[in-house]
């Protein structure tokens, strides 16, 4: 099961007493700010959680798995996430939930 933006909004509604509309807008604005920063080439550091970084990947040779034909894989920029130590520790020590 995955945590969704709708579930995050519902949590803010329940815990902070925000209106459903304000809770949804807060979640949307939070993620929009992360997107904006990454689009502008900035690193995003969330203390106690982790860092979103941009990494430029060079062009490299590849192969079409169906035909075996050599094809170039174009250079591109990718987003990476590195979890912080606090997040790593909490995940390692968490009890797995049954689905």
Swiss-Prot record:
Keyword entries, A-Z: DNA recombination, DNA-binding, Transcription, Transcription regulation, Translation regulation
Database matches in Pfam families: Bac_DNA_binding (PF00216)
Entry keyword annotation includes Transcription regulation: yes
Location of the region described as Disordered in the Swiss-Prot/TrEMBL record: 49-75
GO biological process, one term: regulation of DNA-templated transcription
Gene3D superfamilies according to UniProt: IHF-like DNA-binding proteins
GO MF assignments: DNA binding; structural constituent of chromatin
Keyword Kinase in annotation: no
Position of the signal peptide: none
Highest taxon of source: Bacteria
GO cellular component: a single term: cytosol
InterPro entries: Hist_DNA-bd, Histone-like_DNA-bd_CS, IHF-like_DNA-bd_dom_sf, IHF_alpha
Coiled-coil residue spans: none
SUPFAM superfamilies in the record: IHF-like DNA-binding proteins
Subunit structure: Heterodimer of an alpha and a beta chain.
Recorded family membership: Belongs to the bacterial histone-like protein family.
Job description of the protein: This protein is one of the two subunits of integration host factor, a specific DNA-binding protein that functions in genetic recombination as well as in transcriptional and translational control. IHF also plays a crucial role in the lysogenic life cycle of bacteriophage lambda, as it is required not only in the recombination reaction, which inserts lambda DNA into the E.coli chromosome, but also for the synthesis of int and cI repressor, two phage proteins necessary for DNA insertion and repression, respectively. The synthesis of int and cI proteins is regulated indirectly by IHF via translational control of the lambda cII protein.
Listed name of the protein: Integration host factor subunit alpha
Species whose genome carries this gene: Salmonella typhimurium (strain LT2 / SGSC1412 / ATCC 700720)
